[in-house]
């Protein structure tokens, strides 16, 4: 849960900063974008500088040394079957890719189902789910013998809601249909929560497999999955939306319902692959 609390700031920041940024853009006039970034840079600098001053190790705490002297990162990974680490890296990458694919199209999907006037509110709620997923799933995982179980839960939930929206055509047919609107919003919130929960549980999953003494080096390498997902998730969704379906006008907004639906076909397949990795490639810990 401590890890979840630490990284919940990612989701909470979206909920807090989005309306502030929008307000700044609306009130700063000409050149509002670069003025906004100057203001945010100053605020973030002060907050981060104060934050780093408050960080300190407890006086009597000593870092556990489970890593042998001179042991390289590859030797550390080989303490367990290397396929376990490959599975962890891949399912982390795929979960983030799927999350970013949907989140990057979130506002347009909301407009597509007829809620253009509520985009800001829904974006804030989804950010709360993002932060809540980091806290909730990490706290839930603390009660599990094998932390990989939480990933199985995340992937199953994501598969169920993605499939439900896909097979009902929720995005294409949601405008004016309250049940489909609720289903599409539920998908957005579940994916945001799973995106956050998958991120927050990686350090503890790695520590269970390789020990706290090696966590910094292994976590550093594992975060490359996040970087690669950042390069592929948004671009994948944009490519699908721009090259499939067609843009139409809904309540004065140009959207591509078929394109957004097609994104779900890809994310559903990737979530199924992720679940298979979690089930068959990531070995349970010996604890």
Model-derived regions, located:
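Multi-pass alpha-helical transporter architecture, strongest
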Residues: 48-56, 197, 227, 260, ...
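Flexible cytoplasmic inter-helical loops of multi-pass small-molecule transporters
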Residues: 56-74
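Structural signature of the two symmetry-related core transmembrane helices
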Residues: 149-165
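Helix-loop-helix hairpin linking two adjacent transmembrane segments in secondary transporters
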Residues: 10-59
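Intracellular juxtamembrane helix-capping segments at the cytosolic ends
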Residues: 1-2, 197-210
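A membrane-interface helix-boundary motif in multi-pass transporters
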Residues: 23-42, 239-270
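Extracytoplasmic gate region of multi-pass secondary transporters
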Residues: 17-18, 81-138, 199, 203, ...
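A late C-terminal transmembrane helix in Major Facilitator Superfamily
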Residues: 14, 209-246
């Amino acid at each position: 849960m401590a890890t979840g609390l630490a990284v919940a700031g990612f989701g909470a920041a979206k909920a807090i900063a989005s309306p502030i940024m929008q307000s700044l853009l609306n009130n700063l006039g000409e050149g509002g974008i670069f003025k906004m970034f100057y203001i945010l840079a100053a605020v973030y600098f002060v907050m981060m500088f104060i934050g780093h001053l408050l960080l300190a190790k407890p006086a009597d705490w000593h870092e556990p040394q489970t890593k042998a002297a001179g042991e390289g990162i590859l030797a550390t990974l080989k303490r367990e079957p290397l396929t376990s680490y490959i599975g962890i890296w891949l399912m982390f990458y795929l979960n983030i890719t799927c999350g970013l694919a949907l989140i990057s199209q979130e506002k347009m999907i909301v407009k597509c189902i007829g809620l253009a006037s509520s985009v800001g509110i829904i974006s804030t709620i989804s950010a709360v789910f993002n932060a809540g997923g980091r806290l909730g799933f990490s706290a839930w995982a603390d009660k599990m013998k094998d932390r990989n179980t939480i990933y199985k839960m995340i992937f199953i939930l994501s598969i169920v809601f993605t499939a439900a929206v896909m097979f009902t055509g929720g995005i294409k047919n949601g405008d004016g249909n309250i049940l489909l609107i609720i289903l599409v919003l539920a998908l957005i919130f579940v994916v945001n929560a799973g995106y956050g929960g998958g991120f927050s549980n990686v350090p503890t999953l790695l520590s269970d497999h390789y020990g706290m003494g090696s966590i910094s080096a292994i976590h550093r390498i594992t975060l490359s999955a996040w970087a690669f997902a950042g390069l592929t998730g948004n671009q994948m969704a944009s490519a699908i939306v721009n090259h499939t379906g067609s843009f139409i006008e809904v309540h004065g907004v140009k959207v591509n319902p078929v394109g957004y639906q097609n994104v779900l076909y890809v994310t559903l397949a990737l979530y199924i692959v992720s679940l298979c990795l979690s089930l068959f490639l990531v070995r349970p810990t010996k604890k």
